[in-house]
């Protein structure tokens, strides 16, 4: 389930806001210029679906947001827990950075944690299946896919080189907990 927690950037122990309500999450994020939406597929997306099948299932929303924001390229990324490069991939964006274009992701499956650093606040957004997040360009943030990453996401780009991470060199990301998604409970 999606979740937003907001902290003072000097107090990673106690959230000032904590919600799993999609409308409340969207409302809070809108205050800092971040878009949060819930999408639903027009057709079932089965495990092992091709990128084209994934994009076809969300075509209306993809076309809408691409037209609204001027995206030129859309792709699908899929990361599984058994990926031999999972640690390297996770480490790539764990430190605070920004991009020179909006970072827009839609989670078709799985989850990940976007953490934004805006105006002395830290916004932890756990994105799960059916969540779209659009982080404005130059917003300081980091992303954690967890120790056993599992997600399929649609990514949107305006320029191929715009999505390069520009790292700040600060240690703030290390002050906040790493992402550890809840595992489903097994019946006893």
Curated annotation (Swiss-Prot):
Gene3D superfamilies in the record: Jelly Rolls (2.60.120.10)
Cofactor: Fe(2+); Ni(2+)
Site (May play a role in metal incorporation in vivo): 96
Binding-site list for Fe(2+): 97, 99, 103, 141
Subunit structure comment from the entry: Monomer.
UniProt family annotation: Belongs to the acireductone dioxygenase (ARD) family.
Protein name: Acireductone dioxygenase
The species this protein was found in: Xanthomonas oryzae pv. oryzae (strain KACC10331 / KXO85)
